[in-house]
Amino acid sequence: MATACVIICGGGPNPALDQIDNLIKAYDQVYFVGADRGALRIVRAGYELDVGLGDFDSVSEEERQVIKAHSQEFQAFPSEKDDTDGHLALDLAMNRWPEADYVALGFLGERGGRLDHFLANIWLAHQPRFQAGLSRLTLLEAHHKVRFLEPGQHVLAYEPCLYLSVISLTPVQGLTIQGAKYTLPATDYASPQSLISNEYKASQEPVEIAFESGLVMIFWVNQV
């Protein structure tokens, strides 16, 4: 079965563009959606855009024309709107390619981005429009990778990282962590919890996460 990935580049500073080649090798088909200045960064990295969109208030008119020239489809929005450019891009990607995986670059702002944008991009997990594709969304930066887990059993294959953090966005029931340096028996949490700085074992065995209800984020962290 053919696999597809949509790479969405937001406007955060220094997105992990060096990860794109690895993604291209991993999938049969890769699509590019750029939001505002993120669109320009994709073009400058040498890739053509399937869709360039946003209000383009962070680029010059000349840069806007460059984006337009390298976009198969170009969508301009007013600067005063009830959405962020990044969320518009993700919404479009999930509707146009509903079976794909989604990798969002420049959404975490780990190197100087706005904290309010960071929180908006974490809390998008609660928006109904993103639910269908949430389990296939990865937020990827140079030192962090974030995925969202829904209730059930999940096996996290070993990945080189300093820390593996488990953070709930809601109350959770029956959360267990097995195979990690620090394990957790089935535990209920009545409020969101941050179980950070766990690790894979030296044996590099998978980590198993399970829970009965709630919403959980996994952070792979390569930063002290």
Briefly describe each language-model feature range:
Residues 1-66:
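N-terminal beta-strand-loop-alpha-helix module at the start
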